[in-house]
Swiss-Prot record:
This is ATP synthase subunit beta 1. It comes from Nitrosospira multiformis (strain ATCC 25196 / NCIMB 11849 / C 71). One of its GO terms (cellular component) is plasma membrane. It is found in: Cell inner membrane. InterPro entries: AAA+_ATPase, ATP-synt_VA_C, ATP_synth_F1_bsu, ATPase_a/bsu_AS, ATPase_alpha/beta_chains, ATPase_F1/V1/A1_a/bsu_N, ATPase_F1/V1/A1_a/bsu_N_sf, ATPase_F1/V1/A1_a/bsu_nucl-bd. It comes from the Bacteria. It is an enzyme of class 7 (translocase). It is a peripheral membrane protein. It catalyses: ATP + H2O + 4 H(+)(in) = ADP + phosphate + 5 H(+)(out). Its main location: membrane.
Length: 459
């Protein structure tokens, strides 16, 4: 084992000097003598000095401390032994339930699958959430982004998706908590436990109180575990909450490594780092990874470099809107801004496609008329426009839905709505079958039959 000594510490970045002929390679893991702290080599500065990131707290480090080169990259446990466990960035269990005992370890730095190994799928993944299944359907083996500013419901949507898909899909899932609140990680663990799906989920946490090195690498740790399940021939779900914190950790590290910042202070390697992560999240001929990623949007600005870079990698984008949340409509998904490559008559069928487009056209017409209504009132509209507004308001309310994971807050039991029910309901509203019902009947219900029942109690 090669040994070196610390020559400089600046926050999470540590410079270590080795003998010139024993200089570690980039991404080698170094271990601090007499401590659990792992350092990952990022740059070779020459003359035997390497610049590393500390994957843990760098408190108490001082010059002259001895460091050992393991001669290998960071390796984490993979396989079924990781299911039901909570691990950190290094794959160390943090749930106080003893060692993982996995038979296999795998490096967190892997090459993306070769072009000829990839496979495309058009099979739909039903989520049971009306607005998502209708206007931005997910593909099995696809990549989905949940975009939203602070407090519009990304994590709640994510938890509902995990609950619905984990229960209905009955496959394995990996959840990577990247720089999010520890409380949410705890809530999520108990939610999985109560739903009896914990034995199918591997949890990897690097929360917001941890150093930037942990937050930068924890997404790769979760991805490595998911890749192993995929390579075994399984269909696996990978949830990342939140991909923006991965970028932000990269920004913190980049500045400490001495790189010049680019637009809005982001790292100059933003597109490359994101690309390297996203290209590994893909489906091959042996198995599939369906990935759902929450993306924080700074100051609700979708043109910010971080969310803008993420957009290009996704098959479906679910955009959460503060305006819709302020109306009390949850999930606050914007049906006009959200898109999916699967919304194609050849994939979803003509009925689904035409219903989704009719819903969007009606909502778009209402959006255009809103200014006129605000200035002149409803009476100035033509009869056709009045009808369009009435239907749009019903659609808007019918897009809301009570969630299972929010039941403890709202007291309303959650609803899972099958795709057939969703299409039937919206088709009926658009074609005018339910024009006689009051719009309140459509708010926070599951299928259309519930809305009809609710209308009877309102009359």
């Amino acid at each position: 084992m090669n040994q070196g000594k610390i020559v400089q510490c600046i926050g999470a970045v540590v410079d270590v000097e080795f003998a010139r002929e024993e200089m570690p390679k980039v991404y080698d893991a170094l271990v601090l003598e007499g401590s659990e702290l792992t350092l990952e080599v990022q740059q070779q500065l020459g003359d035997g000095v390497v610049r590393t990131i500390a994957l843990g707290s760098s408190e108490g480090l001082r010059r002259g401390m001895m460091v050992t080169n393991t001669g290998d990259q960071i390796r984490v446990p993979v396989g079924t032994k990781t299911l039901g466990r909570i691990m950190d960035v290094l794959g160390t269990p943090i749930d106080e339930m003893g060692p993982i005992g996995a038979e296999q370890n795998r490096s967190i730095h892997q090459k993306a699958p070769a072009f000829d190994e990839l496979s495309a799928s058009t099979e739909l993944l039903e989520t049971g959430i009306k607005v998502i299944d209708l206007v931005c359907p997910f593909a099995k083996g696809g990549k989905v982004g949940l975009f939203g500013g602070a407090g519009v419901g990304k994590t709640v949507n994510m938890m509902e998706l995990i609950r619905n898909i984990a229960i209905e899909h009955s496959g394995y899932s990996v959840f990577a908590g990247v720089g999010e609140r520890t409380r949410e990680g705890n809530d999520f663990y108990h939610e999985m436990k109560d739903s009896n799906v914990l034995d199918k989920v591997a949890l990897v946490y690097g929360q917001m109180n941890e150093p930037p090195g942990n937050r930068l690498r924890v997404a790769l740790t979760g991805l490595t575990m998911a890749e192993h399940f995929r390579d075994e021939g399984r269909d696996v779900l990978l949830f990342v909450d939140n991909i923006y914190r991965f970028t932000l950790a990269g920004t913190e590290v980049s500045a400490l490594l001495g790189r010049m910042p680019s637009a809005v202070g982001y790292q100059p390697t933003l597109a490359e780092e994101m690309g390297r992560l996203q290209e590994r999240i893909t489906s091959t001929k042996s198995g599939s990874i369906t990935s759902i990623q929450a993306v924080y949007v700074p100051a609700d600005d979708l043109t910010d470099p971080s969310p803008a870079t993420t957009f290009g990698h996704l098959d479906a984008t679910v955009v959460l809107s503060r305006d819709i949340a302020s109306l009390g409509i949850y999930p606050a998904v914007d049906p006009l801004d959200s898109t999916s490559r699967q919304l194609d008559p050849l994939v979803v069928g003509e009925e689904h496609y035409s219903t989704a487009r009719a819903v969007q056209q009606t909502l778009q017409r209402y959006k255009e008329l809103r200014d006129i209504i605000a200035i002149l009132g409803m009476d100035e509209l033509s009869p056709e426009d009045k009808l369009a507004v009435a239907r749009a308001r019903k659609i808007q309310r019918f897009l809301s839905q009570p969630f299972n994971v929010a039941e403890v807050f709202t007291g309303a039991p959650g609803k899972y709505v099958p795709l057939k029910e969703t299409i039937k309901g919206f088709k009926g509203i658009v074609s005018g079958e339910y024009d006689h019902l009051p719009e309140q009947a459509f708010y926070m219900v599951g299928g259309i039959d519930e809305a009809v029942e609710k209308a009877k109690t309102l009359q």
